[in-house]
């Protein structure tokens, strides 16, 4: 949801979804197959290497921001038409996060998205680049 949901603490930029106590996981017993992977030193090393490769290229902060800007440019006038037809900016529509009420313009929404993604990636850098 990239920070735009009011459940399972999706507005948080830190933490893994599967570790959220409100989320029961894939298995009614609480064990998920990927938890076993996270106990494997070989897997963790491969994960770290892969993360660092992507962060140095297509998942760098600059590349992600450019991708967001590219999407905005591609959408062009459709953005304005969308909010003329559905004037929802500044409204909390489930499952939007509660902070949506403070974002009253499209620029506010884009700024929030960029900020949220950047903060999320910084947290992921800390935990995946050990």
Question: Which sequence ranges carry the predicted segments?
Answer:
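Middle-to-C-terminal accessory/interaction subdomains
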Residues: 1-130
């Amino acid at each position: 949801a990239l920070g735009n949901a009011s459940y399972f603490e999706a507005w948080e930029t830190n933490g893994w979804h599967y570790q959220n106590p409100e989320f029961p996981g894939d298995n009614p017993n609480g064990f998920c197959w990927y938890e076993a992977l996270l106990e494997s030193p070989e897997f963790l090393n491969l994960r770290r290497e892969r993360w660092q490769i992507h962060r140095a290229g297509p998942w760098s902060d600059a590349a992600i921001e450019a991708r967001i800007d590219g999407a905005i440019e591609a959408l062009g006038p459709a953005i304005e038409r969308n909010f003329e037809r559905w004037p929802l900016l500044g409204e909390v529509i489930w499952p939007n996060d509660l902070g949506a009420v403070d974002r009253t313009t499209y620029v506010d929404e884009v700024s929030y998205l960029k900020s949220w993604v950047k903060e999320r990636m910084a947290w992921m850098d800390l935990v995946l680049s050990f």
